[in-house]
Amino acid sequence: MSEQVKRVRVTQVGSPIGRKPGQKETLIGLGLHRMNASRELAATPETLGRIRKVKHLLKVEELS
């Protein structure tokens, strides 16, 4: 029996210019390289931690 992994869509809505270097690196780690870029990611604890670190720069939507 396989459990279906929850997914989230993250969209970059804020610029990393003038932010701490770690925040820019976190955006790159999430696969976001420019404004309004979106990615669908698995909602693992690691991914959710990264999202929490830069939540002020992202729009997050839960997918079914």
From Swiss-Prot:
Which Pfam families does the UniProt entry name for this protein?
Answer: Ribosomal_L30
**UniProt key word Manganese:** no
- Which superkingdom, per the lineage? Bacteria
Alphabetic keyword roster = Ribonucleoprotein, Ribosomal protein
Q: Record's Gene Ontology CC terms?
A: cytosolic large ribosomal subunit
Q: Which NCBIfam families match?
A: rpmD_bact
Indicate what this protein is called per its UniProt record. Answer: Large ribosomal subunit protein uL30
Q: Which organism is it from?
A: Acidiphilium cryptum (strain JF-5)
